[in-house]
UniProtKB/Swiss-Prot annotation:
Transmembrane segments: none
Keyword Coiled coil: yes
Name of the protein in question: Putative neugrin-like protein DDB_G0288135
Residue ranges of the region described as Disordered: 85-143, 171-214, 238-279, 402-437
Pfam families: Neugrin
Top-level taxonomic group: Eukaryota
Organism expressing this protein natively: Dictyostelium discoideum
Coiled-coil residue windows: 192-296, 398-429, 462-511
Listed Basic and acidic residues bias regions: 193-214, 252-279
Disulfide bond residue pairs: none
Amino acid sequence: MFRYLQQKSNQINYCNNVKIFSNLINNVKINHYVTKKPLSLHRSKTIKKTQKRDESIINGIVESVPKSESTTDSIKMLMNQLNEKLKSPKPKQKSSKPKLTKPTQSELLMNENENQHEKDDDEEEDEQEEYGEGVLNFDENMDLYDQNDRLAEYEMDENRMEGMEDYVFDDDLPINNKNNNNNNNKQSQPIIETKEIFTQKQQKEEEKEEEEKKFIKRLDNKINIKREEDEYIEDEYIENDNNNNNNNNKYLENKNKNNNNKIEEKPELTKQQQKEAKKRLEERIKKQYGDKANLILFKIEQRKKNGQWAPENKVTRSDMEQIRELHKEDPEIYTIPVLAKSFRISLEAISRILHSKWSPDQTKLHKLHKKKVLENKEKYSPYSKTNKEKNYINLSSQAKININNDNNKNKNNNNNNKNKNNNNNNNNNNNNNNTQKEKYKFTPNVIPNSLLQRIDPKEWYHQVKDYNNYRIDLEKKKNNLKNNFEKNTNEKKEINLKSSYERLLALENNKLNK
């Protein structure tokens, strides 16, 4: 603001005391703008709005500022002095206003070129911010220099698209170097790059073809080698079989000779020595095998008796019956060796099954069943998963108690003890009791102990709980009935009735007394 006022003060020629004006400005701190600073002529975009202000300042005319807008007293004094001097008459002077002239064609062209350069610079800066240092060149001549080369690449490309011959992709365009400013360099670079790319692609394709050929040759060589090895192995295998057979025969002959020599050399053992040797053998087997030692010794004894080990598979009663039925149907088809293979049993065992007439008793079967249960507890236990159906017990319909049932029983027992002499009355009472028992039979749905043992506590916990609650309630009701009956009987002990007529009279008297 200070500079602006100083510049404009030089244009005012009619001010006599310029020193006073400048000293006041230097000593005062202005807090309010008197006039707005106009923009320079070469940058101004709003010339029309600021034209009047510029003309007034150039001609020495300053707009008066009201006192209310000023902030300090010093500014007020300064503005008063200026207003007094401005009101004084003005000498006529030549206008320093520049005369406007029409620009020539050369000037217009220069301005247009400068504007275009500025726009291009701005666009380049924006593109550099988006794409980095490398900026794509979109000149008009780009489609001409690489047209032939690009068509050749298009024809060689396997993944080409039909109808896209004239289309130029961004990847095909070269990147400008900022250092190369000449147009000749710009046109010469892309041609060299396209040729180099084309040659590189051809070289890569040739290398791939060579590698494929080498790979195929390697596979052929490996296949041929494997065939030769297989043939060689087959020949060796046949030769080895023949040699092995000969060697085995020789080995067996030598073994038999050695065994014969050893048998001859071994001395005969006495009974005591045999028992001692047997004990030693049993001790060794027990140390090595533990619990399985008894089974192994049992098999050794069978081997001595029968000359064979124990069978591979044990046969059940149902299997034995099936063997007999099959042999009866077709003895020519279901022969002993066929059955031995199917059931995995020795020939001697099948012959025993077919010719035996022994049938076990119930005691024997009971013992066998116990052994099965002890050996296979998981299979035969009531808690197993397979026996869930057996554990099922219904308690949906529980027994109901009738009070008359217990009262009639107890009354009849007392009457029989008291009235032994009256046979007729006793007979009538017994007949009545039989009829009442048939009507009111007490049949509680009690679970037997055999079923209770089978119940799984995890699945049938609630069922057992209901049963226990039912049993407890039943005992409570019985106790209540007994107590009530004793009260009634104590009252009746004092009365000794001889006949039914006297009994009725006594009952009526009791009711009246109550």
